[in-house]
Amino acid sequence: MKETDRKAYNIVKPNSFGYNPARINVGSIGYYSGAKDIIVSSLYEIFQTSDNIYDRFLWHWFKSKQFQNWIERLQEGSVRLYFYYDKLCECEIFIPTVDEQIKIGNSLDRLDNLITLHQRKYFLIFHNIR
């Protein structure tokens, strides 16, 4: 790809978070766990965590009501509200030890998987009754 073509994109490395600052209020945040670099629109904020953060723990915090409250408090703009990376860095979160983050993140993953399983079972039962 030509150098000039890359200006419209951000490179996303494995184990990175990315979000649209104008759409994060509706959950527009993702995590890339692939093996190779990819590109996304330059409109997205891309970041990686430090070694003292377990990404799955942070992922669940991003999906929490507490994080939504931070977005509502810190977003800025008039017609369209934005939540840029500098505002994300202003959010306050209690960070337990990495071992505790792993336990919490894994427990929440298991709970999410259990909920998904029951939703699928309900869907199959509901559609077979009709």
How would you describe each model-predicted region?
Residues 1-130:
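Feature detects amphipathic, helix-rich regulatory segments
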